[in-house]
Amino acid sequence: MPGKILLLNGPNLNMLGKREPDIYGHDTLEDVVALATAEAAKHGLEVEALQSNHEGELIDALHNARGTHIGCVINPGGLTHTSVALLDAVKASELPTVEVHISNPHAREEFRHHSYISLAAVSVIAGAGIQGYRFAVDILANLKK
């Protein structure tokens, strides 16, 4: 049975390709999932993807992945800057976690410069567009070796 990576996308990421394309580009969430899935397959891994606009669903997914997945790729969206509960869930999952941001939050508004999630992440990738998801999967695959 191949290892699984949990791919979590937070609030508003279902709007990729439609919302602020000058910041986030024209790629869709489906493109993100396809890219991550293809990269995982190169390493003999599978991806379980979830996008939710509800913090509790993301937390539940992290809890449920504990002990069953090899790692997590997460783009928490706006929860990055506000959610201690999501940080605690990342820690509780005990999964190596890579935080991904399509844009560079440090080149944007001041409130976006802080990430709670990065306190528990093994790596943070920002500003690489959706390629950041591919890089994140590669990082987790190499940690597994």
From Swiss-Prot:
<comment type="pathway">
    <text>Metabolic intermediate biosynthesis; chorismate biosynthesis; chorismate from D-erythrose 4-phosphate and phosphoenolpyruvate: step 3/7.</text>
</comment>
<feature type="binding site">
    <location>
        <position position="88"/>
    </location>
    <ligand>
        <name>substrate</name>
    </ligand>
</feature>
<feature type="site" description="Transition state stabilizer">
    <location>
        <position position="19"/>
    </location>
</feature>
<keyword id="KW-0057">Aromatic amino acid biosynthesis</keyword>
<keyword id="KW-0456">Lyase</keyword>
<comment type="similarity">
    <text>Belongs to the type-II 3-dehydroquinase family.</text>
</comment>
<dbReference type="GO" id="GO:0003855">
    <property type="term" value="F:3-dehydroquinate dehydratase activity"/>
</dbReference>
<comment type="subunit">
    <text>Homododecamer.</text>
</comment>
<dbReference type="InterPro" id="IPR018509">
    <property type="entry name" value="DHquinase_II_CS"/>
</dbReference>
<protein>
    <recommendedName>
        <fullName>3-dehydroquinate dehydratase</fullName>
        <ecNumber>4.2.1.10</ecNumber>
    </recommendedName>
</protein>
<feature type="binding site">
    <location>
        <position position="75"/>
    </location>
    <ligand>
        <name>substrate</name>
    </ligand>
</feature>
<dbReference type="Pfam" id="PF01220">
    <property type="entry name" value="DHquinase_II"/>
</dbReference>
<feature type="binding site">
    <location>
        <begin position="102"/>
        <end position="103"/>
    </location>
    <ligand>
        <name>substrate</name>
    </ligand>
</feature>
<dbReference type="InterPro" id="IPR036441">
    <property type="entry name" value="DHquinase_II_sf"/>
</dbReference>
<feature type="active site" description="Proton donor">
    <location>
        <position position="101"/>
    </location>
</feature>
<keyword id="KW-0028">Amino-acid biosynthesis</keyword>
<feature type="binding site">
    <location>
        <position position="81"/>
    </location>
    <ligand>
        <name>substrate</name>
    </ligand>
</feature>
<dbReference type="GO" id="GO:0019631">
    <property type="term" value="P:quinate catabolic process"/>
</dbReference>
<dbReference type="InterPro" id="IPR001874">
    <property type="entry name" value="DHquinase_II"/>
</dbReference>
<feature type="binding site">
    <location>
        <position position="112"/>
    </location>
    <ligand>
        <name>substrate</name>
    </ligand>
</feature>
<feature type="active site" description="Proton acceptor">
    <location>
        <position position="24"/>
    </location>
</feature>
<dbReference type="GO" id="GO:0009073">
    <property type="term" value="P:aromatic amino acid family biosynthetic process"/>
</dbReference>
<comment type="function">
    <text>Catalyzes a trans-dehydration via an enolate intermediate.</text>
</comment>
<dbReference type="GO" id="GO:0009423">
    <property type="term" value="P:chorismate biosynthetic process"/>
</dbReference>
<dbReference type="GO" id="GO:0008652">
    <property type="term" value="P:amino acid biosynthetic process"/>
</dbReference>
